[in-house]
Curated annotation (Swiss-Prot):
The modification Phosphoserine is found at S541. This is N-acetylglucosamine-6-sulfatase. Ca(2+) binds at D55, D56, C91, D326, N327. The form A (78 kDa) is processed by internal peptidase cleavage to a 32 kDa N-terminal species (form B) and a 48 kDa C-terminal species. The conversion to 3-oxoalanine (also known as C-formylglycine, FGly), of a serine or cysteine residue in prokaryotes and of a cysteine residue in eukaryotes, is critical for catalytic activity. InterPro entries: Alkaline_phosphatase_core_sf (IPR017850), GlcNAc_6-SO4ase (IPR012251), Sulfatase_CS (IPR024607), Sulfatase_N (IPR000917). Its EC number is 3.1.6.14. It comes from Homo sapiens. The lineage of its organism: Eukaryota, Metazoa, Chordata, Craniata, Vertebrata. Optimum pH is 4.8.
Amino acid sequence: MRLLPLAPGRLRRGSPRHLPSCSPALLLLVLGGCLGVFGVAAGTRRPNVVLLLTDDQDEVLGGMTPLKKTKALIGEMGMTFSSAYVPSALCCPSRASILTGKYPHNHHVVNNTLEGNCSSKSWQKIQEPNTFPAILRSMCGYQTFFAGKYLNEYGAPDAGGLEHVPLGWSYWYALEKNSKYYNYTLSINGKARKHGENYSVDYLTDVLANVSLDFLDYKSNFEPFFMMIATPAPHSPWTAAPQYQKAFQNVFAPRNKNFNIHGTNKHWLIRQAKTPMTNSSIQFLDNAFRKRWQTLLSVDDLVEKLVKRLEFTGELNNTYIFYTSDNGYHTGQFSLPIDKRQLYEFDIKVPLLVRGPGIKPNQTSKMLVANIDLGPTILDIAGYDLNKTQMDGMSLLPILRGASNLTWRSDVLVEYQGEGRNVTDPTCPSLSPGVSQCFPDCVCEDAYNNTYACVRTMSALWNLQYCEFDDQEVFVEVYNLTADPDQITNIAKTIDPELLGKMNYRLMMLQSCSGPTCRTPGVFDPGYRFDPRLMFSNRGSVRTRRFSKHLL
């Protein structure tokens, strides 16, 4: 499959697309923000970067198990992060955090709808020009390639349709709206192309693999490149390639300690799940778990093809490859059937594997990292001055290169704005308005007042999670993950009140942070007095719109 010509205004292969005839002095001036650690000395090629992003792939429940080739080709050849988190356990806010390097309260994407700023005109106007790919393209001279799922509302007619190509992308091969495997439409540099249900030409994961390999043949050899490949797997509808549809027949969702138990002393939304689950519900989630793994086998093939092609072209040793997911997932934990959105480790913790120049093989890092760090890291690799950005994240490059005596964060923020229906669900008349994502047995995965903010703390002394809900209770959940890794026991009422106050203080500071102030929660003020009702401005409004004032 051949790529269509570049999007309007992009130059073709065969000459550098940035200042093809400028003097060396002028080139240094234009790329001055990207000199960094690599420089632009004669004969020096700045590294290439590939970012592989899956959809809903967990880390806690064994989501990396099917990807044997990926673990061998990326993880074993580089570094695996064992404590990688997302700032929101939902596709669009998390992907926006990757692109901008910002927490949701700073990029203002709060859910998967246009009203929640997902690929809205406001997002396009305010955030897209400042994403790290836009900086790579405009300031660092990288050719940039995107293939796959962008944001859940991308292609919506009210936000420019498929003709809209975000700033910063030289090659654009994006899926309309949410993940599918067949019968979808792609925007190819702003032109729509429909795909059907013929496996050999339409299976999306394979299409992304083919067009990515094509880019490596088609690209300019005068510029470094950045590739972002965002697969549909393992997102529903969990359609595996034909050759993998019988794989993992003896695999079941993990029966860990928090599987199919009541969410005692948790937020009401978790407590409402019916325990024990019915046999039919367990069969359904076991089947979903199995199919998710099946879809990932095609991702494993994609990774292998990509690495082999980079090796064949002689570019592998000068290329950083990142592999991660936009959020985790659950299958029966606390009797919640299947979804993400919740504050627990299974939903907010993701795989993160990196290989590249200067990274020793078979490394594991326990440092607390988040997907807001990906943009700063990639810009740092390109040599861009991070002080010129307003990103909340930190560059992982010192960790990747084995820096010693490194000063690093101890806290990351997780925040989520719940969604609910305005009317009673006709299939569940016993439920009041305000819930959503409900299953036939009326177990719901979300609600308006499932709005929460958490601080996840990892240090030499603590391995804690502290969360507050924006509801009438101002409900608090606290977990000691050293003693209770499955987060079964909420210790909010038994923990030392002084420590509780410190965690609340850190959370308040992170929720009001921006840029550099997000990288540390600051020094605890001994005069601070704990009052959880200060966390949210509307003090328990059930149908909260805490972020809406920022949408322009």
